[in-house]
Amino acid sequence: MKLRLFAFALTLVCLLSFAGMTVAQDAVPVNEGETVITLENGVVGTLNVPESDSPVPAVLMLHGFASSRNEVGDMYLRLAAALAERGIGSLRIDFSGWGESAGDMAESTVSGMVADAEVALQYLQSLDGVDASRLGILGFSLGGGITVFTAGENPDAFKSMALWSTFGNLRDIFIEELTQENFDAAAANGTVEIDLGWRMVTLGNGFFTGLEDFDYQTEFPNYTGSFMVVAGSEDGSADFLDWYREHAQGALRASYLVPGADHIYNVLTEDQTLAEATIKATADWFAMTL
């Protein structure tokens, strides 16, 4: 299938298609209080804390493979605005080696991404303006896997979780998408350069071997808070909606199949209906559960 784990890394295509981001950006207000921060491990993030007389809930947002913190079509930027309108803060980060964060892409691993997420979590927990007892976490595709692993390793940290376009076994899906040939090349040479069609990426063997560092079937049940999973009907991640909903341990659980949507909710088309529906449903979910 097309448009899976790395498809929403088409931010460059989005910029070209929309001539300076007119479609995505014109619909999204620039929120006061949004600042770019650098965490202790060199991870860069964008913090959005709406004005409030009391500490606000907040959502940690984790991007997918070969993407960055604003996500394709600025979906995370737009979601941050929607959350702020509901009185919810957010922190979206670039994983080490991606976006503006420090580090070498070729040294990127699943374990490293989880570590980055944990540093971001600790930062949110330390903020006076954020209610550390009302934190949520969201992941998009590979970021969804990192979300599952982060929450599984920190089961008491998050009150609510949402997944976008998230699969199950990471090794299986990456073999299908990146091919066994690239797995073998990385094992033989230490790194492999892959042309994704819109950008080049250089991955180290540690990325491929690290896909088995965590088991989603083991980690996911550790999380016991509220849970929502979202997928487009035209994407393979829809096959996992039932599994995630049925294995969620919290009292409040939901799945949302977006009819006609692909892996990135058709955000690179002129019609933003499905992308906006996904953003609204997610913002409403966190407003209800945080």
Task: Name every feature range the model reports, one short phrase each.
Residues P55-G64:
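Short beta-strand element of the alpha/beta-hydrolase
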Residues S68-A80, F95, F240-L241:
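The serine-hydrolase catalytic nucleophile loop
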Residues E107-D128:
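Alpha/beta-hydrolase active-site loop
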Residues G129-S141:
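Alpha/beta-hydrolase fold nucleophile elbow
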